[in-house]
A protein has these predicted regions:
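The short coil/loop that forms the "turn" connecting the two helices of the helix-turn-helix
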Residues: 42-43
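Residues within the helices of the helix-turn-helix
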Residues: 34, 53
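Short alpha-helical segments that sit at the start of domains
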Residues: 1-19
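DNA major-groove recognition helix of helix-turn-helix
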Residues: 20, 52
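A short, conserved structural fragment
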Residues: 56-64
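Alpha-helical residues within the helix-turn-helix
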Residues: 38
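Short, cationic-aromatic polyanion-contact patches
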Residues: 9-13, 27, 32, 64-78
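Helix-turn-helix DNA-binding helix
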Residues: 47-48
């Protein structure tokens, strides 16, 4: 069960990355935490924040402190 939760978290973080990328391309600015939640089906802003924190640790996104629309997806180098 723990492995399933980890996989679900990875899939959700991938969806969050994709949502941020698509939203930014469409609007020319990043989404808020609430908009991300609405976009990926999470009701809790705290859950979105937790996933964003994990994504920062993994090096998948950058943020600016105290800025609500300052999330940047870091493209993976292959």
């Amino acid at each position: 069960m723990d492995k399933e939760l980890k996989e679900h978290g990875k899939e959700l973080r991938e969806r969050i990355c994709q949502f941020i990328t698509n939203y930014t391309a469409t609007h020319s600015y990043a989404p808020t935490i609430r908009e991300i939640g609405e976009g990926v089906g999470l009701k809790s802003s705290s859950s979105v924040h937790s996933h964003l924190t994990q994504m920062k640790i993994e090096g998948r996104i950058e943020t600016k402190p105290y800025c609500s629309r300052a999330i940047k997806v870091i493209e993976k180098e292959e």
